[in-house]
Every structure is written in C-alpha cells, then in structure tokens.
Amino acid sequence: MKAVGLVVEYNPFHNGHLYHAQTAKLQTGCDTAVAVMSGHFLQRGEPAVVSKWARTKMALQSGVDLVIELPYLYAVQKADIFARGSVSILNELECEALFFGSENGDIKPFLETAQLIDEHKHILNDRIKEELKKGASYPAAAAIAFSSILHTESALDLSKPNNILGYQYVTSILTGGYPMKPYTTARISSDYHDADLPEGENHIASATSIRKAMIGQNLEACLRFLPAASARELAAYRKSFGLWHTPESYFSYLKYSLSTVTARELQQVYEVEEGLEHRIIRSIRKSSSYQEFMELLKTKRYTWTRLQRMNTHILTRTKKQDMQKLLDNDKAPYIRLLGMTKKGQAYLSEKKKALSVPLVSKLSSFSHPALDLDVKASRIYSLPIEEPLRTEFDLQEYGHAPIRYDEDEQHFLNV
C-alpha cells in the first residue's frame, strides 16, 4: 500500500476538499489518503466551526482513509511550525507523497524557491530584522525580504496563503531529509479568502464564504458547495450542540480570563510580546465584542491572524517556556488517531510496528505535556456549549475511540 499525505483543517469539508483528496490519489498513484488535521483550534487562531470528531466523519465519508490530529502544539502556530509538525507526522506514517493546493499547480517554483532562500538565508534574516525594526509585521517584513531575492518571473508568489504553506511543506521535507515527494495542484474556482458564496453554476466555494453563510443561519445556501456527508454532519452537530463555534462565541471567556490576570502573568503567555500585555488589558476593558477588541488591538506590526492565535493561547494559558520546551523536539511526540476507513486501518496495521513515536487511540493509554495541551484546548472549545451537553462533549475527549468507517458498505462501525 502507498499513501499520500494531506495537511488539512476541513473547516468544514467542502467540494474543494473532495476534489483535493480525489486528485491527490490520482496524481500520485497512491491508494491511501492520510490527512493530518488540526484539532479544535486552527492555524489562524480561530475555533473550528464544528468539532474534530464531526470533521473526521465528513472526511472518512469523502475519500480520506486516515485522519490524524495535528497537536495544538503545531496547529495554532505560524506557517513554518505548522508545516514542520504536520510533515513530521506524515513522514512517521511513511507517506510517499505530500499533496497540497497552490495558486498555479506547478511544484518546480516551490523547489527552486526553497533552494534559493536556503542559499540566501543570512541575507534574508538580516533584511527581516531591518523591516521589523521599522515597525512592519513579520509577514510584511518577510515578504519584503523575499522579494529582494525572488525577482525572476518564475519566482513563487509568497503573498498567497496557499503558496506560503506549500513552500513551508517543501522546506520541511528538504530540511528533515524526508523521503517524501511533494506534489501540488492548482486551486480551482474560488479564492482562499472569498467572503461570499459564488453565483452561477459553480460548485466550489471557499471555506470562509461557507462559514459566513452558515453563521448567518443559512446552511441551505451552502448545500451545493458541500458533499452530502458534510451537510449531514453539520446539521447533526448543530442539532446536538445548538451552535456553530465562532471567535465571538469565546469573547466572554476571553474577557473573564483577561480580567483575572496581571500584566506580569500575561507577559508569560506564548505570543504575548514586546509590552503587548498592557495594550491587551487596556483594549479588553473598552470592548463589548470580539470584533471590537480585535480592532482596538490590531496595529501595523501585529496582524489579525497573529493576534487571534495569541488570544487562543491566552484562553488556554499556554506559557512561552512550556511551548518552547515542546518545540525543541524536531518531530511530533505522538500520533493521535481520530478515524480510519477499512483501507486506512489496513495501512496503519502495515506501518505501526515501525513507528518511532506512540500511536494514541485513547487518552487513558498515554500521557505527555503536548497531549495535556490538546485536552485543555478541547475543554476551552466546549465552553460555549450549554450544560449538560458540555460535560458530555468533554468526556468524549477521553472516551472517544477512533471513528471507524466501512467505505464499501458506507456506514460507521462504532458511532
């Protein structure tokens, strides 16, 4: 059996993701798709609109064979750390290929750019430091530095979110010396951050536009952009727990957290840098919504995404020293299995004896500081759910066995 790795969030799983999973197998010649998926909080610092279990069920019904959780340690991070953790898991599972979406669908510029940047990394680092001193945000500083050496027509456009992540995946493969071949395909139809559902006959929409419509209480308008399985799981989650999760859902908890912490304590939280703790405390006192808080907090130096990640770390009280200690390791400390098809189970049985890190199926069987972070993030995620459903949700984190799906008979075996 041969596997292709996918790094995903599935927030939610839509037709573009279905195309991605199908094309990954076709273009690479692999028969098994392994998805490393962010858990309850995502790379941009947002909560997933529905739980990782609901999103796993969507994926297993739509061509993905194994779903592995990307630990919080890597999931709520800037692109290079996010990619490093994801790729290390795919390598541990002996994926022969990594497949990702990009703007143009050509892998050559990614490989050339990675080599060029590696050759000029000292110049780049110096230029980034210069731009940061001028007050630029890190992404803006990096973009200026990259443009100073990437000045050919064939150079990779690193202003595009998918290209940035793709570049980091390729860099992680090369830096790690992993025997994994990167492939890419062009994104189809909808732009990554399109805020509105497209009109006409198009059946591909951005996850951003789908979430916006869902949160506006209009799931029906999203149906043509979703596989039937995703529509079912979204409706079932809403019926079971009574909400879609949004950043605004957590504002009262964030405000409480910031009302009970000192500036000195806040300064110890991961990604709270350079005196930002004072601005945070001043801004939260004046804010009556998450949107208002973010608008007061945002500056030229700190992007919305960076601040959202910081807010999530405040909610989870993740400290700099704890995170840094965990990040000192080059690879993920465990593999947390969320779900599998029959084919995925066969692939895992073939590979698990060679794993150099523990395979975690149930939390009761394993303990690790990084896993403690995952559990804490899950408990924070459940806060907007009303009791007694919240306690029921929290207990799932410990008692939920990996979801098993029979792709031949098209039904779940244990849910």
UniProtKB/Swiss-Prot annotation:
Changing residue 298 to A: Strong decrease in activity. Changing residue 129 to A: Decrease in activity. GO terms for biological process: tRNA modification. ATP binds at residues 7-20, 101, 162, 187-188. Catalyzes the formation of N(4)-acetylcytidine (ac(4)C) at the wobble position of elongator tRNA(Met), using acetate and ATP as substrates. First activates an acetate ion to form acetyladenylate (Ac-AMP) and then transfers the acetyl group to tRNA to form ac(4)C34. One of its GO terms (molecular function) is tRNA binding. Belongs to the TmcAL family. It is found in: Cytoplasm. Keywords: ATP-binding, Cytoplasm, Ligase, Nucleotide-binding, RNA-binding, tRNA processing, tRNA-binding. One of its GO terms (cellular component) is cytoplasm. It comes from Bacillus subtilis (strain 168). The gene is tmcAL. This is tRNA(Met) cytidine acetate ligase. InterPro entries: Rossmann-like_a/b/a_fold, tRNA(Met)_cyd_acetate_ligase. Changing residue 306 to A: Almost loss of activity. Changing residue 14 to A: Strong decrease in activity. Its main location: cytoplasm. Disruption phenotype: Deletion mutant lacks the ac(4)C34 modification and displays a cold-sensitive phenotype.
